[in-house]
Structures are given as structure tokens and as C-alpha cells.
UniProtKB/Swiss-Prot annotation:
The chain crosses the membrane at residues 12-32. The gene is SPCS3. Component of the signal peptidase complex paralog A (SPC-A) composed of a catalytic subunit SEC11A and three accessory subunits SPCS1, SPCS2 and SPCS3. Component of the signal peptidase complex paralog C (SPC-C) composed of a catalytic subunit SEC11C and three accessory subunits SPCS1, SPCS2 and SPCS3. The complex induces a local thinning of the ER membrane which is used to measure the length of the signal peptide (SP) h-region of protein substrates. This ensures the selectivity of the complex towards h-regions shorter than 18-20 amino acids. Belongs to the SPCS3 family. Keywords: Endoplasmic reticulum, Glycoprotein, Membrane, Signal-anchor, Transmembrane, Transmembrane helix. Essential component of the signal peptidase complex (SPC) which catalyzes the cleavage of N-terminal signal sequences from nascent proteins as they are translocated into the lumen of the endoplasmic reticulum. Essential for the SPC catalytic activity, possibly by stabilizing and positioning the active center of the complex close to the lumenal surface. Expressed in hen oviduct (at protein level). One of its GO terms (cellular component) is signal peptidase complex. PANTHER family: MICROSOMAL SIGNAL PEPTIDASE 23 KD SUBUNIT SPC22/23 (PTHR12804), SIGNAL PEPTIDASE COMPLEX SUBUNIT 3 (PTHR12804:SF0). One of its GO terms (biological process) is protein targeting to ER. It comes from Gallus gallus (Chicken). Glycans are attached at residue 141. This is Signal peptidase complex subunit 3. It is a single-pass type II membrane protein. Residues 33-180 are lumenal.
Length: 180
């Protein structure tokens, strides 16, 4: 331990060990925190169309447009180890061809420092809600759920589902007008 390089190496190794221990401490202090909050989802309008599907055989598929409201207070999720939240609204339903279908309709990233209270009114689907067939027409159990990924500074990336969902009955007829 006489040379400058060996002393610098020892100092660097010790500093790296201390930083690793501090990072683990940051992770362990928030690892078991409950990240679920109450969520209120309301659907004000569902529009259903039967359109030509250009992704496969030339058959027609169901395309839905959903207008919804979301209310949630995500303030309690944010602590010193949360960098951001990735929120997404998904629809789950079953058809005769598929036991479980999951479609993401909308998403949003909330950074630390942004307003974590959601009061969203008359939001439209951000992404197309296609069914690979005609499974949406008359479907009585399409469930909308708000979920989020907590992106931490250190630690695991948990997937959390909000404690509130909405089951929406879809219409029995297709809309033919071009209003949305």
C-alpha cells in the first residue's frame, strides 16, 4: 500500500462498496410499501364499429372507441425512491375464440414533481381497441382496469393494479356514422 495507484484503488473499492450498501438500503426501506390506491373509473360512451381488418385475412373486425373518466390520488405512492409512474388503462374480456384478451387503451407517465392527482374527464382511447374478430359486439363483461409500474431509483420494478375497476357492457349494434 505504498504507491499512489494502490491507495487510489483501495479508496475506489471502498467507495464502491459503501455506495452499493447505500443503494441496497434505499431499496430495502421502500421494498415492502403498499403501492395500491383507490381508483374510480367511469365510462360515458362506447362506440362500436365493424371495420375491415387489413392485418390478416380480409375479414371484418370490431373496433371500439371508449370515452372514460378517471379519478385517482397517486400522492401516497410517491416517496423518495420513486422516479416516475407509468400508468395504463387496460380492457380485459373473453370471447369464444380467446379465453383472455387484454388491450391497452390509454397510458400516461407521471414524473416526480408532476401533479399526481388524476381528475380526467371525457378522455378518449389513445390506442385503437381492435378485436381480432367480432367478440366486442354484445359483450357484457369488458373490464377496464387502471394499473401502473413504479419506476424506482433503486430496486425492483413492481406492477401494481389500482383497487377499482369498471365492467362495461358493449352495445349490441354497430354504429355506422362517422362521429366520434
Amino acid at each position: 500500500m505504498n504507491t499512489v495507484l494502490s491507495r487510489a484503488n483501495s479508496l475506489f473499492a471502498f467507495s464502491l462498496s459503501v455506495m452499493a450498501a447505500l443503494t441496497f438500503g434505499c431499496f430495502i426501506t421502500t421494498a415492502f410499501k403498499e403501492r395500491s390506491v383507490p381508483v374510480s373509473i367511469a365510462v360515458s360512451r362506447v362506440t362500436l364499429r365493424n371495420v375491415e381488418d387489413f392485418t390478416g385475412p380480409r375479414e371484418r373486425s370490431d373496433l371500439a372507441f371508449v370515452t372514460f373518466d378517471i379519478t385517482a390520488d397517486l400522492q401516497s405512492i410517491f416517496d423518495w425512491n420513486v422516479k416516475q409512474l407509468f400508468l395504463y388503462l387496460s380492457a380485459e374480456y373473453s370471447t369464444k375464440n380467446n379465453a383472455l384478451n387484454q388491450v391497452v387503451l390509454w397510458d400516461k407517465i407521471i414524473l416526480r414533481g408532476d401533479n399526481p392527482r388524476l381528475f380526467l374527464k371525457d378522455m378518449k382511447s389513445k390506442y385503437f381497441f381492435f378485436d381480432d374478430g367480432n367478440g366486442l359486439k354484445g359483450n357484457r363483461n369488458v373490464t377496464l382496469t387502471l394499473s401502473w409500474n413504479v419506476v424506482p431509483n433503486a430496486g425492483l420494478l413492481p406492477l401494481v393494479t389500482g383497487s377499482g375497476h369498471m365492467s362495461v357492457p358493449f352495445p349490441d349494434t354497430y354504429e355506422t356514422t362517422k362521429s366520434y
